[in-house]
Each structure stands twice: as structure tokens, then as C-alpha cells.
């Protein structure tokens, strides 16, 4: 009987040891990927394994639901880097189910939706993702109204896609008040003023953009626009 109990205890010890080792290996893999900057596909698989296979122990491992939400975001970001915008949107949405006020997740859904719309050919699908992009940027700004990336993104959509020039002007003015003066911003302001029929300010901002141009392509692009305006 003593021998039987000894065998049982040894088996239990080995079983617990293997389980602990498995968890430790998973944590080690995550740390190694974070440090080494491992590829997106590898990270996605590890993050999925962490969430799906270890779901029963998730609270013990990460200590809070917020950390679980973070892994949904990380998966979304890796899909985003791969240009797989549909799955990216799915995982950012999972994050928002836990943390609906995450302005970054709303922003990334907006960018992913916008990029997805640009690659589609079916009109209804394009409109669907353009609407999702706009609503996501607006939701991001409703949570944090000074988030520059969302301000620029919604302005870009309003100038080039939705022709909401007055709304774009308001957002661009806000970015200007915040000190933005990089090339892409100045070009967008020029395009906005041109669309509003204000050629004086359009030329002013295109001229400012030309001084910020850092590549030959940028310089030639501004030059072509300026020559057509004058």
C-alpha cells in the first residue's frame, strides 16, 4: 500500500511539475518575443495560445482582465502589421468588449477599416468600412479629444473621401493650435483650403509644405501642385 501511495504521489508531482513547466515556458516565450521583436505570425500564435488554451488560469497569470484585453490588442496590432485588416478589426473589437473606452483600439479599428475599404471593389462593402472608419475615429476623439492621430485621420478622410471640408478645417485648426507643422499635415491643410475655394491659404500652406519636404518625390509633388495653382 505504501508503494502504491508513493507511486501516486510521484505521478501527481510530475503532473503538477509538467503543468507548471508548461505555463513557465509560455511566459518565457512571450518574454523572449517581446525582447527579440519576433515576427508577427509567431507572436499571434503565442498570444492566441495564451488566451485560448490558458483561459481558465488567465486571472492567475495576468492578475487582471485589463491585461487580457491587452493581449487582444497585441494580436490586433500584429494582424495590422501583416496587412490583415479584417482579423485586426476583430481583435481590437474584442479588446473593446472588455475596455470600451480604449481610444487607441477605436483609432486602430478606424485605420484598419479605412485601409480595408481602399482595397475593396464592391461599393456596399467600401461604404460599410468607410462608415466604420469615420465612426471609430469620432469615438476615439469622444474619449480623448486631443489625440493627434485621430484628429489627422478624420481630417484626411473628410478632405479626400467624404468632402466634409468645413469639419476637416475645424479639426486641422485644432491640430495647428497644438503646434503640428509636418509635411503631411501642411499638405492636407493646403488641400483643405483648395477644396474650400480659398486659394490664398492653399498656396500659403503648400509653400510651407515645400519647405518641410525631405525627399525629391515630396518636392516634385508640391511643385506640381503649386504650378497648377499659379
Curated annotation (Swiss-Prot):
The keyword Repeat applies. It comes from the Bacteria. TPR repeats lie at residues 69-102, 183-216. Keywords: Repeat, TPR repeat. The keyword Repeat applies. It holds the Pfam family TPR_1. This is TPR repeat-containing protein BB_0298. It comes from Borreliella burgdorferi (strain ATCC 35210 / DSM 4680 / CIP 102532 / B31) (Borrelia burgdorferi).
Amino acid at each position: 500500500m505504501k508503494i502504491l501511495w508513493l507511486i501516486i504521489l510521484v505521478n501527481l508531482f510530475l503532473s503538477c511539475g509538467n503543468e507548471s513547466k508548461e505555463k513557465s515556458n509560455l511566459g518565457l516565450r512571450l518574454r523572449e518575443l517581446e525582447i527579440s521583436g519576433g515576427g508577427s505570425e509567431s507572436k499571434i500564435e503565442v498570444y492566441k495560445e495564451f488566451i485560448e488554451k490558458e483561459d481558465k488560469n488567465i486571472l492567475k497569470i495576468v492578475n487582471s482582465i485589463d491585461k487580457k484585453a491587452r493581449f487582444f490588442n497585441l494580436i490586433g496590432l500584429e494582424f495590422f502589421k501583416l496587412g490583415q485588416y479584417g482579423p485586426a478589426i476583430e481583435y481590437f473589437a474584442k479588446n473593446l468588449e472588455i475596455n470600451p473606452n480604449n481610444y487607441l483600439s477605436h483609432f486602430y479599428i478606424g485605420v484598419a477599416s479605412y485601409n480595408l475599404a481602399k482595397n475593396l471593389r464592391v461599393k456596399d462593402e467600401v461604404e460599410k468600412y468607410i462608415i466604420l472608419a469615420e465612426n471609430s475615429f469620432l469615438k476615439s476623439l469622444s474619449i480623448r479629444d486631443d489625440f493627434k492621430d485621430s484628429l489627422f485621420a478624420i481630417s484626411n478622410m473628410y478632405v479626400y473621401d467624404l468632402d466634409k471640408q468645413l469639419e476637416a478645417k475645424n479639426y486641422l485648426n485644432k491640430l495647428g493650435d497644438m503646434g503640428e507643422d509636418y509635411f503631411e499635415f501642411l499638405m492636407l491643410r493646403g488641400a483643405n483650403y483648395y477644396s474650400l475655394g480659398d486659394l490664398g491659404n492653399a498656396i500659403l500652406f503648400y509653400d510651407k509644405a515645400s519647405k518641410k519636404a525631405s525627399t525629391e518625390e515630396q518636392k516634385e509633388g508640391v511643385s506640381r501642385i503649386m504650378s497648377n495653382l499659379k
